[in-house]
A protein has these predicted regions:
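Non-heme Fe(II)-dependent double-stranded beta-helix
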Residues: 2-97, 103-104, 142, 229-231, ...
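Short, solvent-exposed loop/turn segments at secondary-structure junctions
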Residues: 8-10, 85-86, 102, 120-121, ...
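Non-heme Fe(II)/2-oxoglutarate
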Residues: 28-29, 34, 140-145, 178-183, ...
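Short, charged/polar surface micro-motifs in flexible loops or helix N-caps
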Residues: 64, 89-91, 120-123, 135, ...
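Short, structured patches in soluble enzyme cores that scaffold and shape functional sites
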Residues: 83, 99, 116-120, 129-131
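Glycine-rich phosphate/pyrophosphate-binding beta-alpha loops
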Residues: 100-102, 111, 191-196
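Short, conserved beta-strand element in jelly-roll/cupin
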Residues: 105-122, 175, 183, 208-212
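Double-stranded beta-helix
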Residues: 122-189
């Protein structure tokens, strides 16, 4: 993973406006998590790029695809989905440690998430990563952000208790400013603390991209997230169709 300073500074206001629209008109799949004492709100939504003009503008007209191509060393770049995560002020809900790959109906050797903060985020509340975890050769059981398992009997092992054994891992994280980006592989274990700031949101727009060799994976009997319920692709098919548009095509 790497931090890209100022990569999208010129798009901050656009994405903030898009998130305002999104939060006022969420998708049915949106989730809102409350803290233990009912304090704050953690808003999570995805797959709205085709109905929110600001998201679509950023995805197709920023340099995100070119950044993704360089990071993945890929000639082709496709959109997998966008993901919005907003922790309102004084929201004590953490983002649990997880990998993105086990949630997904896609597989491939070239993947990257571009996590773009839209507020100043200090080191103690930023997204953190377990360095090298994308090379462990393991997928861990995906869980919802309230800690419940996405699938109870998926055959995957539970993710290690990172918080109880932080000294056993190399954990990376950066204080970031609006318009910076943190790039990471779908297999990388990551998580974040709650937002303890009393007067500031923690808004982030995450763009999930795939490169050469991306294939659809149907996990029969298991829930994937996002669900993409209307797809007719078969397992092993290349990603095709309007759901996964090419942003760069060789």
């Amino acid at each position: 993973m790497t931090v890209l300073r100022g990569a999208f500074t010129g798009w901050v206001d656009v994405l903030r406006a898009g998130i305002d629209t999104n939060m006022n008109d969420p998708d049915p799949n949106a989730r809102i998590y409350k803290g233990e004492n009912g304090n704050g709100r953690f808003f999570v939504d995805y797959c709205n790029w085709d109905r929110i003009a600001e998201y679509k503008n950023f995805i197709f007209n920023s340099n995100a695809a070119h950044i993704g191509a360089a990071l993945m060393n890929s000639q082709n770049v496709q959109l997998f989905h966008e993901h919005v995560l907003v922790k309102e002020a004084s929201t004590d809900v953490p983002t649990p440690w997880h990998q993105d790959a086990p949630y997904y109906c896609v597989t491939g050797p070239k993947t990257v998430s571009l996590w773009v903060p839209l507020d100043t985020i200090e080191r103690d509340t930023t997204l953190e990563f377990v360095s090298g975890s994308h090379l462990w050769g393991k997928h861990f059981r995906p869980q919802r952000f309230d800690g419940s398992a996405l699938n109870e009997d998926d055959g995957l092992e539970e993710i290690p208790d990172i918080n109880q054994h932080r000294d056993e891992y190399e954990i990376l994280g950066w204080a970031v400013e609006p318009g910076d980006a943190i790039a990471f592989d779908y297999r990388t274990i990551h998580g974040a603390a709650g937002n303890h700031q009393p007067n500031r949101q923690r808004r982030a727009f995450s763009l999930r991209l795939v490169g050469d060799g991306a294939r659809f994976v149907r996990r029969d009997g298991l829930v994937s997230s996002p669900p993409f319920p209307n797809l007719t692709l078969k397992s092993g098919d290349p990603l095709t169709g309007d759901t996964f548009p090419f942003l760069l095509h060789a």
